[in-house]
C-alpha cells in the first residue's frame, strides 16, 4: 500500500509540475509551487485511484482528477493560514505561504490553484 501511495504521489506531483510549467501566472508560480509541494502524502489522490479502479476508470484519468483535487486542497490550506483566518505561521513545519511570500501573493496563489483545478477537470472532461 505504501508503494502504491508513493507511486500515486509521484505521478500526481509529476502531472502538477508539468501542468504548472504551462501556466502564464509567472508571478504566482513560486507561491503556487510552494503551497502545492510543501509536503503531504497526496492521500486524496490515492483514495480517488482506489475508488476509480472499482469503476474501471483509467489510471491516467484518475491521476488527472486527483491532481485537481490536490489543487483544491492546497488552495484551502493556503487560505486557511491567512491572517484573516487562522493566521498560522507554519504549515507542515515550513513557513506558510503568506509568511514565505506575502499575504496578497498567498491569496492570489490560492485563488489560482482553485481556478487551475477546474481548468484541469474541464480539460479532462473534454478528452474522451
Which residues are covered by each model-predicted region?
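N-terminal amphipathic/basic leader segments beginning at the initiator methionine
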Residues: 1-20
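Mg2+-dependent prenyl diphosphate-binding active-site environment of isoprenoid biosynthetic enzymes
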Residues: 17, 22-128
